[in-house]
């Protein structure tokens, strides 16, 4: 549907991944929980918690009902890097706007189903009810659970960090916040403390070697002569050279470290370093 479409657009088929598709940003599961697709990865800032709070806030669901899918190129758009403040300062905007738009559509769907104006509806934890009559209600799961909005949002035609989208709905003001600003426990603390989760340094593959790059001591310097015999005493260590790229590899990381320190290289200045 077009930007701003509210009714009769629900589909059982998910639209293709596209920044203009609301379904590329947020989904309501069959059980009423929420999945948000975040096109960045966490670099230790706890972005999954922060983004989860923002999505929960705009959709009026509890934080525990939100799952953040991060950096999966099959399901998430390219939002660029997440270093420093980029994860939230820019990266949260599309999800905030998309979640607000999803909430608007859900309210309109509930209005049609309950035959009550949107102004007379309220939301609590994913359940929309008539103000003053909590018995007259409908949940997100009943409205759209497991299906798709099939609705458009306005995309600024940028990719990476500048990417942004917006719908008709206006996100909440700070005075309305109930979830954003809460101090919630981070999901990564326990596995960092107890070492239960794998890190890149723990990866092992068959035939794997460890390497160290040998760098010139001066800008643009060239390796004129490399004495490979200087590291023969280090088990399994050998030189890798491709034009002016120089490195050492070994089966054990410490052996690669030692080889990098002990490899004798004669460097010469480059008349045109850059």
What does each model-identified segment do?
Residues 2-274:
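Cofactor-binding beta-sheet edge motifs in enzyme active sites
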